[in-house]
Amino acid sequence: VCSSDLANQWNNYRQSRLISEYESVVKDESRKGTINYEKEWERANAYNQSLLPSILPDSFAIAAASDKPGEEYMSCLNILTDEMMGYVEVPKINIKIPIFHTTSEEVLSKGAGHLEGSSLPVGGENTHSVISAHRGLPSASLFTDLDQLEDGDHFLIRVLDQTLCYEVDQIHIVEPENTSDLAVEPGQDLVTLLTCTPYAVNTKRLLVRGHRVPYEEETIEKEEKESPMSLYTNYLLWVVVGLAVTAVLIISLWQYDKRYKRKRKEKQAAAGGAPKDASDRKEEER
């Protein structure tokens, strides 16, 4: 249990670092000349428009099996050139997870993946973006608590220099091959968060859909909370840090004592071989 919680904390830390790096790049005034946000939005919107002939893209199955996603797709929203397009934040369950291109196993082991073939998460009419993440991994929490969301809750998609807010309006559990709930709906701006269910069984898919609403900080703040699991894992992290610091101190004191005794013996030898005390003899026997 301790090792899995520690791995979970490490992954949370790594995700936080990625998100912090992303935010620093977005907010860095000196980079505004090198990153044309308007152009990035235009490219992403053009990509989404290209998907519209197929309201329910057949490319879902193809994308899931493909090891070589399209170059145009991979280049969209890739301002850090690390395949991270933004991050999803769910205040009610206290998570912030990087969103990467594709839903490959490598991607899903470290964060959330955007389902290629669905709309890129930039909002707009006639769009339906699908964000997928694992649930119940021993090394990462990810979408483990997604089943706690209810109609009326909110989640955020932070991409480039924009924050898009979505209100949950539909929660379905479906068979893996059933993609009808992922269809684009005319005139709608939708995002679905997708994960496996039941917990640790994973034979079905949990789909939490939201429609775009105005972003109001007061509403989001009301939903924020620190869950008991977060308190537990944070406490555990401090326990582990405390044990590590204690171990370092013990090793440092042992090394200092060893060096002190060695220097004392050297001084005794230089002084003509003064008799060794019991502690010196014991040290030599070691």
Segments (PLM) and residue ranges:
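Solvent-exposed, non-transmembrane regions of membrane-associated and secreted proteins
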Residues: 1-233, 257-268
